Curated annotation (Swiss-Prot):
This is LYR motif-containing protein At3g19508. InterPro entries: Complex1_LYR_LYRM9 (IPR045291). GO terms for cellular component: cytosol. PANTHER family: OS01G0342800 PROTEIN. Belongs to the complex I LYR family. LYRM9 subfamily. Disulfide bonds: none annotated. The lineage of its organism: Eukaryota, Viridiplantae, Streptophyta, Embryophyta, Tracheophyta. It comes from the Eukaryota.
Amino acid sequence: MKKVLRVYGGVMRLVRLLPADSRPYYAKYARENFVNYREVDQSETSLDELFQRAYNHSLWVLKKYSIDESAATKLKEICFE
């Protein structure tokens, strides 16, 4: 559970790097996705797949707004520890 909260916090920190007009959309999108997967199977593979997806999607959004993906280094460390 702690890792899930750390990943969520990492995603929300990246949302703050986005342009001001797009932050509310991505903050809501991230929250909805974390809430939707609250009841997911707690096996390591299920969670690892979700962490991989969260990281990849975060990179995609950063690239979309021309933000250097090195900003997601901390999230990568959390997701793949």
